[in-house]
């Protein structure tokens, strides 16, 4: 079912604004940015990495950072604030599909939230890209949009949204740091799930943490920084914290100052510290918990300041015990035990199943420093995990979670000069994300097409599964498994473990994506080749504290420290604890499983340069990212694939409302196969066949525009149904109102007459016998309506003129005309003017064209009370002089076809105005200078105009001055004059009845409607048709037995016509002349069918004695030629025009030099002006038939009517005018139908003569029902 269109409505029915289907006025949007490049890379004319890069560069240079590849968003980091995340921008994306608005991260968020509500499926967004490309910012903006879009007045819902938003500044402070590439680089990965209740309001959340970069706590590359929280804390700590925890500035700590960078551009550490505290309060961290968090941070910073020196024996010794004492105070452990754990390592030997000896092995300064750093990293890592768990506790406080939207913000691909274990883990996770992208977009899409037997051309792409297996595989072992084996073999010596690992790497030399070098190895990732250092890599993989450090923490009296280290040391356990590599593999696989359960969206971020400059665009660097992100392959598959796919069942469940065969009043009514239901939905929604394919179990829609059309139709379904009911009800009410108004108007006219006609008659009396009259002024439909320019209405030309001139009073008369403008030494000029009359003032308005627009100015503003006289000639011209009282202005001499009405209304408003009619018009051409204009009859003057030259008006002779206006013709259709046609609904009820509905509809079209009122038949053919249905004997004619017996006629043709029999007859238009001897041209409007209460012919004696009357004179040929419309002429809406359709046949009575012709319909019902160029002479190729017989009987639908038609034609052809007997030719005499026609024509001829004579005395003008403008 397509979108239901609203039918035409009456203009006088006021509708609510919100329901208006009116097209909004087009306006220029000055804020709209010019489109640069293409907004969707699938629209590129040439698909290549270079063309993609060039398009991204164009948009970046113009401040446009977002581009689509289908439903995948490409984001280029602008390194500046573009002002595109304001509330106003956010609101503009609500409820819009991605094609209605420019590409934006808000559009992806809106699509996710809409799909969550519409399909009740979990959603997730995978944000990928290298470090510094803008992944964290994109995640924040998605959270911002979802929180704003899911508006709720519930206090609990509002609180959970605040908590979700507060996780951003909190986790950024503890998990992000400044790097060489990015000032806010995520040094951990997180997957945030926002959970929604059944009303799709956020009610809970959960955060999963992935691989915090612990090494950054103790060391950073030069010009990089530690985690943000350390600089925030040291710069913004309160005096209380400084006294309790000995907080110093960041330059005083080794962990924050060693890299030589304690500040960063665009970062305000003190302000961010306040934001972190506010986030803690929002999430629900009490003050005691906050104190303990900052106590641990202070302990970590002071642990970094512990230094070691070498004693006489070459072993490590604490350089300053005051530092260790303060650390022991912060950790609430024994100071001597702390020092012992830092400079010694406990070694335990075993003999079989028995425990061996325990040795205290002293450490050298390098080893002691490593132990110190291990303790700091362990405390920070466990503190971060505790914060994430604590946030989850707060986010899970509200039950009712049903579905979720997941946001993955994880570290990007990294390639440094020296890459170690952290980089291999980070790059491995990015490989897994790339694998998901390939599986869910490229590979899965092509496999789906093959499985569903969809026509498809396979496209080659790089599947990085081989690289993932190289790192994570167990059998055969991958790189991380080989590293675990090396640690197990040489667990006591890190150097030995590194050498063992290097030897095991020889197993991978046959792998094309691996290369071994001296103390290094290379992995060929999808993003590029990365070289990793072997030295120290196995020690980082151990990810465990020495047992003596764990035992040290177990002795603390600080309950918070005990809480973040919950596991006790199992001294008897022989099982190898999981390494960092094991944990990251497990986390990555769990992440893949979680993402696979949700409907994914993708954001691919690109970093334009390494300098973090808003103006630089490194083509080489971006081109490299375009290649390893696989954007070209993505574009190719997107252009060849389908934008949407869904199983038949879910598609029908979603869109069954769009087909009337599948639904009724919102209920699903289809009981057939779901595949057939899908076909019905697509058919009724008018989706082209090229836009979709039907697979084995699913339907595939090619373009997103088709999907958006389906969604839009579904959204409007209930509105359309409600609008349909409202439309029907309003139509019923309006018909009732219209009927009441027509009854009231008719009653008022019967009692008191029509006020407009009364005003016309009053004006006629004012000029009675004084001024010749024009033809148009005599029409019965002419009435003094007044406001012909519709100045009192809104949105009309008249109202526009009224506003421009500044007229505020109600307008009683308005019309266009001309005014004589005199120039010194030159002939007077006729200028177009507009005349507007109010109750007090008469305005003459001039018009000029300026800058291709019409401008109206006030020429005269005349007080009606200051008009002394109105002067007119006694001929039929339209000139009129307005004589003013003691005016300093010249008297206006105006020309308007409605001069009589203007004069009448002026007289009504001011009874003192004198009306002077004579052969001349006298007016003041200049103040106190009387000028005379003569009038003269001239045959060379235009038929409907005049010529003004040298103060003389030349005009043709008009109708006599004492001519009276014709009576208003009666409407042929009762009150309204038009039948009320019932509108058939276009809505199909069911598929089963479609054919029957169509056949009924076609049959109805073949049935012509009867006219509303029978008319007097004046022609022989019309009389015969009328008599065939409803013959009546003429009581004034003596009856004789010489006529053909009517019993034969009655026996064959006296039955009543059925309701489906329709007959149209013609009537002759009456002449203005009273001569009854002249035969006039016959015009035939539609005649009403015979009424049911009419009696059929009866056999009577009187009928048998009807004499044969004398035959009428021969029918005259048509006076006016016939013309055929060659084109459609809808008209401009003026009542003087006659709208035509191509092929319509009319009479042309006269042609004007202006290019217009006066045309009349064949039935004489309407007359008006048509363009001469639109008309061509009509060539009648049918057999020659008398004009009166043409169209006498139309659209008969049964055999009986057909016989009547043949009878009439036979009667007309057989009449021998001027003879005593009337009958057909000899060939027809043997035909029984001919016998009927002979008698019928003879019997009705006399009746026709009498009626023709009576109609000649009737001087009513029934020419059309136009509102002629004279």
Swiss-Prot record:
It comes from the Eukaryota. Residues 1066-1078 have a biased composition (Low complexity). Residues 1089-1098 have a biased composition (Basic and acidic residues). Residues 404-486 are annotated as: Actin-binding. The keyword Repeat applies. Residues 36-715 form the Myosin motor domain. Residues 719-739, 740-765 form the IQ domain. The keyword Phosphoprotein applies. ATP binds at residues 129-136. Residues 771-961 form the TH1 domain. InterPro entries: Fungal_myosin-I_SH3 (IPR035535), Kinesin_motor_dom_sf (IPR036961), Myosin_head_motor_dom-like (IPR001609), Myosin_TH1 (IPR010926), MYSc_Myo1 (IPR036072), P-loop_NTPase (IPR027417), SH3-like_dom_sf (IPR036028), SH3_domain (IPR001452). One of its GO terms (biological process) is actin cortical patch localization. It is found in: Cytoplasm, Cytoskeleton, Actin patch. SMART domains: MYSc (SM00242), SH3 (SM00326). PROSITE patterns: MYOSIN_MOTOR, SH3, TH1. The modification Phosphoserine is found at residue 357. GO terms for cellular component: actin cortical patch; cell tip; myosin complex; plasma membrane. One of its GO terms (molecular function) is hydrolase activity. The myosin motor domain displays actin-stimulated ATPase activity and generates a mechanochemical force. This is Myosin-3. The lineage of its organism: Eukaryota, Fungi, Dikarya, Ascomycota, Saccharomycotina.
């Amino acid at each position: 079912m397509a979108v239901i269109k609203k039918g035409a409505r009456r203009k006088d029915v006021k509708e609510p604004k919100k329901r208006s289907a009116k097209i909004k006025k087009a306006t220029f949007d000055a804020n709209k940015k010019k489109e640069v490049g293409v907004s969707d890379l699938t629209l590129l004319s040439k698909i290549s990495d270079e063309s993609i890069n060039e398009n991204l560069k164009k948009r970046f240079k113009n401040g446009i950072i977002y581009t689509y590849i289908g439903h995948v968003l490409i984001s280029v980091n602008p390194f500046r604030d573009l002002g595109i995340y304001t509330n106003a921008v956010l609101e503009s994306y609500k409820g819009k599909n991605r094609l209605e608005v420019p590409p934006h991260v808000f559009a992806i968020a809106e699509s996710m939230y809409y799909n969550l509500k519409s399909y009740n499926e979990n959603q997730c967004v995978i944000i990928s890209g290298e470090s510094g490309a803008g992944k964290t910012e994109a995640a924040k903006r998605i959270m911002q949009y979802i929180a704003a879009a899911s508006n709720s007045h519930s206090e609990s819902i509002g609180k959970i949204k605040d908590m979700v938003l507060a996780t951003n500044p909190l986790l950024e402070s503890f998990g992000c740091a400044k790097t060489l590439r990015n000032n806010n680089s995520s040094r951990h990965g997180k997957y945030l799930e926002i959970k929604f209740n059944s009303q799709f309001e956020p009610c809970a959340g959960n955060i999963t943490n992935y691989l915090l970069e612990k090494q950054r706590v103790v060391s950073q590359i030069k010009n990089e920084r530690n985690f943000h929280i350390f600089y925030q804390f040291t710069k913004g700590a309160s005096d209380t914290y400084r006294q309790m925890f000995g907080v110093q500035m960041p330059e005083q700590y080794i962990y924050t100052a060693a890299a030589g960078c304690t500040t960063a551009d665009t970062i305000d550490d003190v302000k961010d510290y306040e934001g972190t505290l506010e986030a803690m309060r929002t999430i629900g961290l009490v003050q005691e918990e906050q104190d303990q968090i900052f106590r641990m941070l202070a302990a970590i910073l002071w642990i970094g300041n512990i230094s070691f020196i070498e004693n006489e024996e070459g072993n490590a010794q604490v350089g300053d015990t005051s530092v260790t004492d303060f650390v022991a105070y912060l950790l609430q452990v024994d100071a001597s035990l702390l020092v012992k754990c830092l400079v010694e390592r406990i070694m335990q030997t075993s003999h079989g199943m028995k425990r061996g000896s325990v040795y205290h092995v002293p450490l050298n300064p390098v080893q002691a420093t490593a132990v110190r750093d291990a303790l700091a990293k362990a405390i920070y890592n466990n503190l971060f995990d505790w914060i994430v768990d604590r946030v989850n506790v707060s986010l899970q406080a509200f039950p009712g979670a049903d579905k979720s939207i997941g946001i993955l913000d994880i570290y990007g691909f990294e390639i440094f000069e020296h890459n170690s274990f952290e980089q291999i883990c980070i790059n491995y996770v990015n490989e897994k994300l790339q694998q998901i992208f390939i599986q869910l977009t490229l590979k899965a899409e092509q496999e789906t097409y093959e499985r569903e037997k969809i026509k498809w051309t396979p496209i080659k792409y790089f599947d990085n599964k081989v690289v993932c297996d190289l790192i994570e595989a167990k059998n055969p072992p991958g790189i991380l498994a080989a590293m675990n084996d090396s640690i197990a073999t040489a667990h006591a010596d890190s150097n030995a473990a590194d050498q063992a690992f290097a030897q095991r790497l020889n197993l991978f030399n046959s792998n094309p994506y691996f290369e071994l070098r001296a103390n290094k190895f290379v992995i060929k990732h999808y993003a590029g080749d990365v070289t990793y250092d072997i030295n120290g890599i196995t020690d980082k993989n151990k990810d465990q504290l020495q047992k003596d450090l764990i035992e040290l923490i177990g002795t603390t009296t600080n309950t918070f420290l005990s809480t973040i280290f919950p596991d006790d040391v199992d001294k008897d356990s022989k099982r190898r604890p999981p390494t960092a590599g094991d944990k990251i593999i497990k986390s990555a696989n769990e992440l893949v499983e979680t993402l696979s359960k949700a409907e994914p969206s993708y954001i691919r971020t690109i970093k334009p340069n390494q300098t973090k400059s808003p103006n630089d665009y490194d083509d080489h660097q971006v081109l490299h990212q375009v290649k390893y992100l696989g954007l070209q392959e993505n574009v190719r598959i997107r252009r060849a694939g389908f934008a949407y796919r869904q199983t038949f069942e879910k598609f029908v469940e979603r869109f069954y409302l769009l087909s009337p065969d599948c639904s009724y009043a919102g209920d699903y009514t289809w009981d057939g196969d779901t595949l057939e239901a899908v076909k019905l939905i697509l058919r009724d929604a008018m989706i082209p066949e090229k836009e979709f394919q039907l697979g084995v179990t699913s339907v595939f829609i090619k373009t997103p525009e088709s999907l958006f059309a389906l969604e839009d139709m579904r959204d409007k379904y209930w509105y359309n149904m409600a609008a349909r009911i409202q439309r029907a009800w309003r139509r019923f009410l309006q018909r009732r109102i219209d009927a009441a108004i027509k009854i009231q108007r008719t009653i008022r006219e019967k009692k008191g007459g029509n006020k407009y006609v009364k005003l016309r008659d009053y004006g006629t009396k004012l000029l009675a016998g004084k001024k010749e009259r024009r033809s148009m002024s005599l029409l019965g439909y002419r009435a003094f309506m007044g406001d012909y320019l519709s100045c009192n209405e809104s949105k009309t030309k008249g109202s526009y003129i009224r506003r421009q001139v500044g007229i505020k009073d109600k307008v009683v008369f308005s019309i266009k005309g001309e005014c004589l403008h005199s120039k010194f030494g030159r002939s007077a000029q006729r200028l177009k003017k507009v005349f507007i009359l109010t109750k007090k003032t008469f305005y003459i308005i001039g018009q000029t064209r300026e800058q291709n627009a019409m401008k109206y100015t006030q020429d005269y503003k005349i007080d009606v009370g200051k008009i002394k006289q109105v002067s007119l000639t006694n001929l039929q011209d339209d000139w009129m002089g307005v004589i003013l009282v003691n005016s300093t202005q010249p008297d206006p001499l105006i020309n308007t076809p409605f001069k009589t009405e203007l004069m009448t209304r002026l007289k009504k408003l001011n009874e003192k105005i004198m009306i002077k009619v004579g052969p001349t018009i006298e007016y003041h051409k200049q103040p106190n200078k009387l000028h005379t204009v003569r009038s003269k009859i001239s045959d060379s003057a235009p038929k409907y105009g005049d010529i003004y030259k040298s103060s003389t008006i030349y005009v043709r002779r008009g109708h006599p001055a004492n001519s009276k206006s014709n009576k208003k013709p009666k409407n042929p259709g009762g009150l309204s004059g038009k039948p009320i046609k019932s509108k058939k609904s276009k809505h199909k009820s069911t598929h089963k009845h479609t054919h029957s509905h169509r056949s009924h509809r076609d049959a109805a079209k073949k049935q012509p409607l009867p006219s509303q009122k029978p008319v007097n038949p004046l022609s022989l053919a019309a009389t015969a048709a009328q008599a065939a249905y409803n013959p009546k004997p003429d009581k004034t004619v003596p009856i004789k037995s010489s006529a053909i017996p009517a019993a034969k006629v009655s026996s064959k043709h006296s039955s009543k016509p059925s309701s489906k029999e329709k007959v149209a007859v013609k009537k002759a238009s009456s002449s203005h002349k009273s001569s009854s001897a002249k035969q006039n041209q016959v015009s035939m409007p539609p005649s009403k069918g015979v009424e049911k209460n009419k009696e059929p012919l009866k056999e009577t004696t009187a009928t048998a004695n009807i004499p044969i009357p004398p035959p009428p004179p021969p029918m005259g040929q048509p006076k006016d030629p016939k013309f055929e419309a060659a084109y459609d002429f809808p008209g401009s809406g003026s009542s003087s025009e006659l709208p035509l359709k191509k092929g319509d046949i009319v009479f042309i009575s006269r042609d004007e030099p202006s290019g217009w012709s006066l045309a009349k319909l064949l039935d004489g019902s309407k007359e008006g002006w048509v363009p001469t160029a639109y008309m061509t002479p009509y060539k009648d190729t049918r057999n020659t038939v008398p004009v009166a017989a043409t169209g006498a009987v139309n659209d008969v639908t049964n055999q009986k009517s057909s016989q009547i038609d043949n009878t009439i034609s036979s009667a007309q052809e057989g009449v021998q005018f001027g003879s005593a007997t009337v009958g057909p030719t000899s060939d027809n005499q043997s035909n029984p139908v001919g016998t009927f026609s002979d008698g019928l024509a003879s019997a009705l001829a006399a009746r026709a003569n009498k009626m023709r004579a009576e109609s000649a005395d009737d001087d009513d003008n029934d020419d059309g029902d136009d509102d002629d403008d004279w």
